[in-house]
Amino acid sequence: MAAQHKRAAEVGAAVLEAGGDALDAAVATSFAIGVVEPWMSGLAAGGCMQIWRAGEARAHTVDYGMRSPRGLDPADYPLAQGGKAQDLFAWPLVKDDRNVQGATAVAVPGVVAGMELAHKRFGRVAWRELVAPAAALAREGMLLDWYAGLMIASNARALSRDPDAAALFLEDGQWPPLISWTAVTEKHLDQRKLSHTLETIAKEGPKALYGGDVGRALAKDIRDKGGSLSLEDLAGYQAHMVDALEVPYRGGRVFAAPGMTGGPTLAVALNNLQKKERPGYVDYARALDAAWRERFQTMGDKEGCTTHFSVVDRAGNLCSVTQTLLSVFGSRVVSPSTGIPLNNGIMWFDPEPGKPNSLAPGKRCLGNYCPVVGETPKGARFALGASGGRKILGTVLQLSSFMIDHGASLEEAFHRPRIDMSGEGRVIADRALPREVIDELNRFLPTATVRRGIFPYAFAVPAGVLREREMNMGCTEIMSPWGDAVAEKEMR
């Protein structure tokens, strides 16, 4: 089990050790990661899951992306005079950042419905047992170590604007938690309300959120703060399971999500790479540049701040899961009744009217998440994905190519230098690349070099697993202070 937080990975690995399926482990990890990494995902998230069923030799996609509330009025998001938004991407500025921050930015979440749909189809372990570990983690409260302090401090000003977010994440409602440089920290977030919410969802099932008491309290909190999400929006939400988008690639295969995700754009990029025998970094940049151009012309341009985890079980079933609140800390709003940090999915829409992706009521969001499962020419199967908004696509492309085209192991692929080409007319390259590669990239597009670091991330943050000759392995971003892969035997 490979995830962006070891505690969440341990939850999934424990499910595997107890005899659960990869899908069971994915569901348990989905709930757990929202507790221990609350700025990335949680019960208010949306996302997508790729599933490989070894017995069927077939890939499935579960799409649980967000939707705009049906009662949303685009007139409530007037454009400000001049300027561009300062968050994840340069939309025209909306008055008071109503599409970015606050309850007006909250979209209908889908992650709980997505987990329910996948669990009903493939799960073996009881729903309550899969949600219970997350409730226990929330009862304990997320440990406030140096990295948590860094993430909260970097968003403290925005969090302070919502009294409930400030009460949860900030000391005295205004200061980021101060972590001692030398002492072992014993500080924890007070997530008892979230724990109670998770206990209710464990006992009553997803209906508690989608039409029940949890949903009723959540919708009231959002409306009391000025948002438009209603209980009817929650009750009417549906996740969808469809066949995955299959991309044959040089003797191997990559399965991605169709529709309003990064999957179709990844397929374009992979098909562009087919023309090169052993593609290099300039080939990656060219393939990504062409794919982004097509995406911008046909689908729009979106970003996000997400989390990703991947799992493989002893039978060879794989799951690759990406879920997100969109921005870091989402809308920077917390529901006081439920303890749920809320998304800002409305920012996924273009605030200018008359565009293909313009803001409208009851509309699906277009995301960049791109979880995949794949197969190398030698028959090894992998599941991987990443967090990082636009950076996700290039990372998934390169990691897949490293393994399929260059025969790299999972560990080797994750340690190799990468580039980022996110459709902005420039390339960001790892400074560890040879000078001649940098020069060649510069001849194609202006290229800046950066050192791979902990914060901020210049590249996406991947997590992946691989099964080869009945041996399972996992790996996470090498610079991540929290990410880790955990084997089920470690939980014995």
Feature map (PLM): residue ranges:
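Internal maturation/activation junctions in enzymes
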Residues: 164, 270-325, 334-338, 344-345, ...
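Active-site rim segments in enzyme catalytic domains, especially the processed small/beta chain
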Residues: 36-39, 46-68, 85, 228-230, ...
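Short, small/polar residue-rich loop motifs at catalytic or cofactor-binding pockets
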Residues: 241, 303-306, 367-369
